[in-house]
Amino acid sequence: MAKPCYAVVDLETTGNQLDYDEIIQIGITFVRENKIIGTYHSMIKTDLEIPPFIQALTSIEEDMLNQAPYFHEIAEDIYKQIDGCIFVAHNVAFDLNFIKKSFKQCHINYRPKKVMDTLELFKVAFPTDKSYQLSELAEAHGIILNNAHRADEDAATTAQLMIIAFEKFESLPLDTLKQLYYLSKNLKYDLHDIIFEMVRNYDEQTLSDRFDQFEQIIYKKQIDFKAPTVQFGGNLKALYTLVTKELGLTYRPQQLYLSEIILEQLMHSEKAMIEAPLGSGKSFAYLLASLMYNIETGKHVMISTNTKLLQNQLLEKDIPAIKKALDFKINATLIKSKRDYIALGLISQILEEESSNYEVCILKMQLLIWITETDTGDIQELDLKGGQKMYFEQKLETYVPVRNDIHYFNFIKRNAQNIQIGITNHAHLIHAAHDNSIYQLFDDCIIDEAHRLPDYALNQVTNELSYADIKYQLGLIGKTENEKLLKSIDLLEQQRILEKLDIPPIDVFGLKTTVNEIHDLNEQLFTTMYDIIQSSEIQDDEVHKLHFVYHFDVTPILNDLHAIIHKLNMTLEFFNGMSHKSIKSVRKQFLYINDRFKDIEQSLKNKHTCYLSIKNLNQKSTIRLNVKDYDVKEILTKQVLDKFKSLTFISGTLTFNHSFENFKQWFNKDIEFNTYEIDTTVTSPNQTTVFIPNDVSSYNYKNINDYVSSIVNYVIEYVSVVESKCLILFTSYKMMHMVQELINELPEFEDYVVLTQQQNQNYKIVQQFNSFNKAILLGTGTFFEGFDFQSNGIKCVMIAKLPFMNQNNTKYWLMESEFTSTFKEYVLPDAVTRFRQGLGRLIRSENDKGIIVSFDDRLIRSNYKQFFEQSLERYRQKKGDIKQFSTLLKKLKKENAKKP
């Protein structure tokens, strides 16, 4: 029997309106037996105008189609080539509907027997990919795609990815492939037929040694860490000297001193606070101290960071470099809380649950493939979003471990003694519960970027009740006996009657009525919240595009909560004495929902700080109620300070006014800390100049146009004189976008790449910024820190405004109860810290040279200016107008040109 041929099709069109728009380019790549066997490509003439957006997206201009055929001239040829093939496309509905319409206009009835959507295929085959856009997939799998949104290249790329996916399926254990087949019957297209053929043609073989089996699940075996065999007879200085020499790094006595201080805290189980200026190489210092501690004592160290970026830098760059220099194995791994790791029993329960829901079906297939690949069992590898994430978290919350369960966190616990360095982040450090956490595994902890710890603690102490979440959780139960969990109860009652099961009768109608009453009570609860929002003073957050209400009477909400909790308690009593599996599943779901309401009710009764938020003022469905359950100081004391014998807090910005007292206030205990303010900086006054314009008017929020124009004028002067890259930091998205619009309109920036901060794209934007010689990056809060600005020439950082949090910020509201003076004790130190972090973006090594421009005149006229001025002590300072700025730039450019 001949193997099927796949016609992988991609179309470019004048738009996405099927009834109006037309095809302007077609690309087809033919695949048989996982090999590309041919291609077809043609531009297609149209009498429609090609919109500018489409021209920009596809790089197809109207004159490129002048000599191209109309579709009707090549329709017969295309039809002959794809007839009998499996029709394949990425997001197939678009391409299939357009080509069927175009064929129909040529009196050709095209109806492919089988259709496959590669968007569906790739979601299943590549469960850990962060994006399923074609360009992102190509990059992730090493396929070169030079011209995205050109039909011929997109079709070829899709075909190559399809082959990779098929080969992956064919390498899976047979039992896994069979399960994928049964699940794929619930998908939208014909992937099940393709998987069936793979099963039918599968070469019988025993299960590979790489795999093991738990119930019906085939999973990749975990390989234990081997005990490290480190042979090094020297002290820390010898270790530091060897590593710096082997890696070609500069020997820095102050960096060695920092490492020695950290080692001393570890050796004597001390608690310490260390400020080591930005660019001082502190991560290298604490890694070597941790390694030396392990060599001398056999004990291991936990290192906590605040970003995934820094985690990845430690695990993928810094630690491998040290391994290479020393030529011996270092066991270092990422460690999280227990709930972040998968239990195979949970996967088994998810697979057993009957559901025809499309997203749940995709998730089940993803889990089956992921568990054959993962070494860690880290659930975040799946990057679940939307409905899948809500479904999985609900299953995780209600999961009761089965007998002989295999939990991946136990792998970490089992190997703890052989892990020399554990890497975690602040969120996991604070979230972990004492009975199943990383605290059992490590006595010693180093917390890098410790100044960010309170922010993560604040997230941890805040509980949330959202309309969307509760609606989803109730939806899993269903509203009628033909839906979801209610259907399983109805089937159980029918089974009881027909098979005379020895269980009490189930009042399905009564249960259904109760469930609908709970739905109504939930609607009433959020209607009450909606009415409160509409009648209250509303504050806006432009960053997250949310609206907030802080001052309101919680009594009406408490009344509605009491009613819904009472109804849920009565419903739970309905299940008393029933132990059937289906009953347990429904009861667990009601318990989960009830606990969510009870936690919020208790906090409101205790008069904890709370606020309401709404994304769309006209949609009740976007409401969230947030309540602060604990003080940040309490959680940091109990969850961090009390849990480790040795604890070192380290940051480039840990002091305020040259004192650690502000950071000490985050802990409830009067405890002695060793404190060190270390001058390891490589910055000399000649490297950096801080320029403060005196010709920029004070910021006025009612009219910021003049302020924005002044900023742009200074940027123009900089790029005109220096012709190098520039980072501009904002505290407002509105101002950032105003500057962006002006820059994009001006001819002075034609040669520049202008990049703007985007959600979930920061890492990629930083890479792009660092790769261009002429680039301007506009960013807000996240770019004030944790960002390595690379440039061969003069570097420039412009700070539009001092980074004070808005007094309507939720953080301000939530933290108000913990301070006598919120501004002096919290807001001002936070702003100074962020300002110092912003300054630190500029000089990261002894070779860097640059200029900082701070436009906010509060830096020189406010009654708190001295706290910011202390941040500028190590820099040359100049005040002047734009002409003096230009003179300074010319001088810097001349000095930089003299560098060897």
UniProtKB/Swiss-Prot annotation:
Residues that, per the record, bind ATP: A276, P277, L278, G279, S280, G281, K282, S283
Keywords, alphabetical? ATP-binding, Exonuclease, Hydrolase, Nuclease, Nucleotide-binding
Return the SUPFAM superfamilies for the record.
Answer: P-loop containing nucleoside triphosphate hydrolases, Ribonuclease H-like
Keyword Nucleotide-binding on entry: yes
Gene3D superfamilies membership = P-loop containing nucleotide triphosphate hydrolases, Ribonuclease H-like superfamily/Ribonuclease H
**Sequence ranges assigned to domain Exonuclease in this UniProt record:** 8-161
**GO cellular component annotations, sorted alphabetically?**
cytosol
**One Pfam family for this entry, by name?**
RNase_T
- Could you tell me the Gene Ontology terms of the biological process aspect for this record? DNA replication proofreading
Q: Where is this motif: DEAH box?
A: 448-451
Helicase ATP-binding domain span? 241-496
EC number(s) given by UniProt: 3.1.-.-
GO MF term (any one):
3'-5' exonuclease activity
Per UniProt, residues of the Helicase C-terminal domain are: 714-883
Family, according to the entry, reads as follows:
Belongs to the helicase family. DinG subfamily. Type 2 sub-subfamily.
Q: What does this protein do?
A: 3'-5' exonuclease.
Among HAMAP family, the record links this protein to: DinG_exonucl
User: What protein am I looking at?
Assistant: 3'-5' exonuclease DinG
